Regions:
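Preference for extracellular/luminal or secreted protein segments
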Residues: 1-27, 239, 260-530
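N-terminal hydrophobic targeting/anchoring segments and the immediately downstream early-domain regions
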Residues: 1-80, 419, 424, 444
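Short glycine-enriched loops at secondary-structure junctions
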Residues: 12-17, 63-73, 113-123, 163-169, ...
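Second-shell residues forming the walls of enzyme active-site clefts
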Residues: 36, 44-61, 71-73, 138-303, ...
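Short, conserved catalytic-motif segment at the N-terminal edge
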Residues: 526-588, 609-614
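Short helix- or helix-capping micro-motifs
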Residues: 617
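Active-site-adjacent structural elements in enzyme catalytic domains
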Residues: 43-60, 91-111, 299, 304-309, ...
Length: 617
C-alpha cells in the first residue's frame, strides 16, 4: 500500500479546520500519500497544516505549489512577481535566474519541495484562453532560454522544477480545465516549436515534466489526452527524448482528463508512463482502482515499484531525508524580505516596453510649455499610474469606466480638447476604442500605456496608428503602473522587447530603447539602501515637530539618480493653516537655511568638532 500511495499527490486546501484536517489525515493514514499540492491560502496556515501532515506521515511527503509567478499565485500576503509574459520582455536572462533563486528561497521557507514551473508553452495563438500571460512568448528559443534560466534558479536552491504542459499547450483555443483541447500541427512543426523548449529542458537535466490534457493527433490518433497516451509519455518523452526525471500528470480532476465511466484516470495515467498522479478527484477510489489493477495484472508491479523508487530518490534530492518542520515565527517577514521587494521592482522596471515613439516624444520634454492630461480607461482617477505621473508634473486626471454613459464619455473628451499631451492608460479591453479617441489621436499628442496582455493593443489599432507613442506594461499591478509612468517622463530607461506579435501592429522583438533623463522613483533596496533605516526618518521628524524646531518639512532622499524616500510632514506655520505636501514650493531663503547648515555640519563632523547628538546652541 505504501508503494502505491507514494504515487499520489492530493490537492489540499491550507485550512486548519477539523473537517479539512480529518480529510487530509485520512489520505495520510489510509492510502499513505506521497505528496500534497496546496491550493490558495495564507503562508502561516499552510505552514501549520504542512507541519501537522508531515508529522503524521511515516515517510516525509513532497509538498508542492503551483507558483508560476511565485508564491503569490496561491498565497496571500506574499511578494507579487510578474507573470511570464512580462518576464519574456526582459533581455537579461541572468536576472530571470536570480528571480528563480528568490522564488526557490521562499519555497524553502514554506517547506515546499516542488514548484510546478516554469510554463514552457510557446504561446503562438492570440486566442489561447488558458496560457496567454503564463507563457514567456511566441519564440521557442526565447521560451527555452527564459524557462531554463528560471528552472536553474529554482533548482540551485534545492527546489524541484516541473516544466509544463508537455507536449505543448501554446497553440490551443480551448481550456483543458473545461474540455480536451486539440493541437493539430504535424510532427515537424511540433519538433521545431512546441517540443523545442522541453528538449532543451531535458538536455539540461532538470527534475520534472507535467504532461498536459491535450489531444495531439500527430503523436497519437487514439483520441486520448497526451497525459493518458503511452505513445506520448513513454515512447516520446521517456524513450525518444530521454527524459529520466519525474513525470507528473496535470490535475486529474480537470475536465480534459475525463475518461469513460469504466476507466479510472489514475490507472490510465500510470499505464501511459506517468510517475505521479496529481490531484485526482477521488484519491481513495483511485488508490483502490490502482491496487486492483496491479492484482489483476493490468498494471505491472515491477513498474510501480520502479516509480516508487524514483520518487523516493527525488525525495532524497529534495532533502526530505533530513526533514525539518516549517518555522512559523517570523515567517511573513522572511518571505517578504528586502531582496524580494528589490527583485519584484527590478523585474518590472526591466520589462516596460516602448513600441512606438514618433519624433522621440518620450521621454516627455519641455514640460513648462505643454499642458498634460492623463486619461484612465477602465480604472478610476488617482490610480498608481496617474499618481506617479503627478510626481513629474501638474497633471489633470480623467477616467472612463465600464459604467460611464455616452454623455459622460463625451464630456471627458470635450474637456481633453484643451490639453497638448494626453497620456492614456488602458486597463481593460472591455471598453472599446471610440471615434472620439481616434479624433484625439489625430489632433493631440497621444501617448498610450497598456496595462493588459499585449494582444489587447489590436483592439485600439486605429488610434494607435495615429498616436505619438505606445508603452506596454503587460500587467496592471502598482509596480507596473509606476514604472510605465517613469518611462514616459524619463525616470527610467525603457529596455523591454515585445515577446509576442500583435497582429496588424508589431512583430515579436519590437522594442525602442529610451533614455533616463530625470530622477526616478525606486525601492530603497534597488540602490543598496536599507528600508528599515529609512523608517527612522519619521521618528526624527516627529521629535522635531514635537519640540517645535519647525512647523513642518519635506524629506527627500535620492541616491544614484533615483528617489528612494519622499514624504511631507506638518504645516507651513504653527497655526496649522497650510499643510506641507510633495508639491509645496519653498522660497530660496527657506532652502538655503537647510542646505547651508548641512554643509557646515558635515565639515565639522568630519573634523570631529561636532557630533550628530550635539545641539547647535
Amino acid at each position: 500500500d505504501e508503494r502505491i500511495g507514494q504515487l499520489f499527490m492530493v490537492i489540499a486546501n491550507p485550512k486548519s479546520d477539523n473537517r479539512n484536517m480529518q480529510r487530509l489525515m485520512r489520505y495520510v493514514n489510509e492510502i499513505k500519500i506521497g505528496g500534497i499540492l496546496f491550493h490558495k491560502g495564507d503562508p502561516v496556515t499552510q505552514a501549520e497544516v504542512t507541519n501537522r501532515l508531515q508529522k503524521a506521515s511515516r515517510i516525509p511527503m513532497l509538498v508542492s505549489l503551483d507558483g508560476e509567478w511565485g508564491l503569490s499565485m496561491r498565497l496571500s500576503g506574499t511578494t507579487r512577481f510578474p507573470k511570464n509574459m512580462m518576464l519574456g520582455a526582459i533581455e537579461d536572462n541572468a536576472l530571470i535566474e536570480e528571480y528563480g533563486k528568490e522564488v526557490g528561497r521562499q519555497c524553502r521557507e514554506m517547506g515546499i519541495h516542488i514548484n510546478f514551473a516554469p510554463d514552457m508553452d510557446v504561446n503562438s495563438n492570440v486566442d489561447n484562453p488558458v496560457i496567454g500571460l503564463r507563457s514567456f512568448g511566441e519564440n521557442p528559443e526565447a521560451v527555452s532560454e527564459k524557462g531554463i534560466a528560471y528552472a536553474r534558479g529554482l533548482e540551485s536552491t534545492g527546489i524541484l522544477s516541473v516544466s509544463k504542459h508537455f507536449p505543448g499547450h501554446g497553440d490551443t483555443s480551448e481550456d483543458s480545465h473545461e474540455t480536451l483541447p486539440v493541437v493539430r500541427h504535424n510532427r515537424a512543426r511540433l519538433d521545431s516549436v512546441e517540443l523545442l523548449p522541453f528538449k532543451r529542458y531535458i538536455y539540461d537535466g532538470f527534475a520534472g515534466i507535467m504532461t498536459g490534457h491535450l489531444y495531439v493527433p500527430a503523436l497519437d490518433k487514439s483520441h486520448k489526452p497526451a497525459s493518458f497516451s503511452k505513445a506520448v509519455v513513454t515512447d516520446l518523452l521517456q524513450k525518444e527524448l530521454g527524459f529520466q526525471g519525474l513525470c507528473f500528470t496535470d490535475a486529474l480532476a480537470m475536465k480534459g482528463a475525463s475518461t469513460k465511466k469504466t476507466d479510472n484516470p489514475s490507472v490510465k495515467a500510470l499505464l501511459a508512463g506517468n510517475d505521479i498522479l496529481l490531484a485526482p478527484a477521488a484519491p481513495i477510489n483511485d488508490f483502490t482502482a490502482v491496487k486492483e489493477a496491479i492484482e489483476e495484472g493490468v498494471l505491472d508491479l515491477e513498474a510501480i515499484e520502479a516509480k516508487c523508487l524514483k520518487i523516493l530518490r527525488y525525495k532524497y534530492i529534495a532533502g526530505l531525508n533530513a526533514y525539518k518542520p516549517v518555522e512559523t515565527k517570523g515567517l511573513s517577514k522572511r518571505l517578504n524580505s528586502p531582496h524580494a521587494a528589490w527583485m519584484a521592482a527590478k523585474l518590472n522596471s526591466e520589462a516596460i516596453t516602448v513600441l512606438k515613439n514618433e519624433d522621440t516624444i518620450l521621454p516627455l520634454k519641455q514640460l513648462n510649455k505643454k499642458k498634460i492630461a492623463a486619461l484612465s480607461i477602465g480604472d478610476g482617477v488617482g490610480n498608481e499610474f496617474q499618481k506617479m505621473l503627478g510626481e513629474y508634473d501638474s497633471i489633470a486626471c480623467f477616467s472612463i469606466g465600464r459604467r460611464s454613459t455616452a454623455a459622460q464619455v463625451q464630456q471627458v473628451y470635450n474637456k481633453l480638447q484643451k490639453y497638448d499631451v494626453i497620456i492614456c492608460g488602458v486597463h481593460t479591453i472591455r471598453i472599446p476604442e471610440s471615434l472620439a479617441l481616434r479624433q484625439l489621436a489625430a489632433k493631440k499628442e497621444l501617448v498610450y500605456a497598456f496595462f493588459t496582455l499585449p494582444y489587447a493593443c489590436k483592439e485600439y489599432k486605429k488610434s494607435i496608428e495615429k498616436a505619438k507613442a505606445v508603452v506596454l506594461a503587460y500587467e496592471g499591478t502598482p509596480l507596473a503602473q509606476e514604472y510605465a509612468a517613469q518611462v514616459i517622463f524619463g525616470g527610467i530607461a525603457a529596455k523591454g522587447k515585445l515577446p509576442v506579435s500583435i497582429p496588424g501592429l508589431y512583430y515579436a522583438g519590437t522594442g525602442i530603447f529610451t533614455e533616463k533623463t530625470r530622477l526616478g522613483y525606486h525601492q530603497p533596496e534597488e540602490v543598496g539602501a536599507n528600508p528599515d533605516r529609512l523608517d527612522v526618518i519619521e521618528s526624527i521628524v516627529k521629535a522635531g515637530l514635537d519640540e517645535k524646531a519647525y512647523p513642518g518639512c519635506q524629506v527627500l532622499v535620492a541616491k544614484d539618480g533615483v528617489i528612494i524616500y519622499n514624504k511631507s510632514f506638518g504645516y507651513f506655520d504653527y497655526e496649522s493653516r497650510q499643510p506641507v505636501t510633495e508639491s509645496s514650493v519653498y522660497d530660496l531663503a527657506s532652502a538655503s537655511k537647510a542646505a547651508g547648515t548641512l554643509l557646515a555640519v558635515m565639515k565639522a563632523y568630519d573634523e570631529k568638532k561636532f557630533t550628530l547628538n550635539n545641539k547647535i546652541s
